[in-house]
Curated annotation (Swiss-Prot):
This is Ribonuclease H. Mg(2+) 1 binds at D16, E54, D76. The keyword Protein biosynthesis does not apply. Gene3D superfamilies: Ribonuclease H-like superfamily/Ribonuclease H. GO terms for cellular component: cytoplasm. It is found in: Cytoplasm. Its EC number is 3.1.26.4. The keyword Nuclease applies. Residues 7-148 form the RNase H type-1 domain. PANTHER family: RIBONUCLEASE H1 (PTHR10642:SF26).
């Protein structure tokens, strides 16, 4: 466990994506914390997928940072976790093709995310969704609210 002086220098980020229908109305949300300051961000898109919104949440959160940072980033998305920690370098090496030689889905977002992750020192943390993790619950609410707001706006 890092001591409090080390912990104060870490940007804590929680991200989540949501989709009402898949594909359908999507939203993303992120919560950033640093030295007692907190920033909540969200956005939406239609049509989209839950996986695109999960990726967009991480991209938008990292894009908020103005200089290289030490980050602890939590997500409930196995897709994001496995993509970044297990698959992305193989995809890149294979010209953005999967092991089955099929084009990587969401390669546009994976490429953006890869470029952003290279600017920071990131500790990736998977958390179980809808299991009472306060920051994940907040990110989930931001994402869900953004998707619902877009759905209501487009149906009005």
């Amino acid at each position: 466990m890092p001591d409090s002086s080390t912990q104060d220098k870490i940007v804590m980020i929680a991200t989540d994506g949501a989709c009402k229908g898949n594909p359908g109305f999507g939203g993303w949300g992120a919560l950033l914390r640093y030295q007692g300051h907190e920033k909540a961000i969200s956005g939406s898109e239609n049509p989209t997928t839950n996986n695109r919104m999960e990726l967009q949440a991480v991209i938008e959160a990292l894009s908020c940072l103005k200089k290289p940072c030490q980050i602890e980033l939590s997500t409930d998305s196995k897709y994001v976790m496995d993509g970044l920690t297990r698959w992305i370098h193989g995809w890149q090496k294979n010209g953005w093709l999967t092991a089955a030689k099929k084009p990587v889905k969401n390669a546009d977002l994976w490429k953006q995310l890869l470029a952003l992750t290279r600017q920071h020192d990131i500790a990736w943390k998977w958390v179980k969704g809808h299991a009472g993790h306060p920051d994940n619950e907040r990110a989930d609410q931001l994402a869900s609210d953004a998707a619902i707001a877009l759905m209501q706006q487009e149906k009005a």
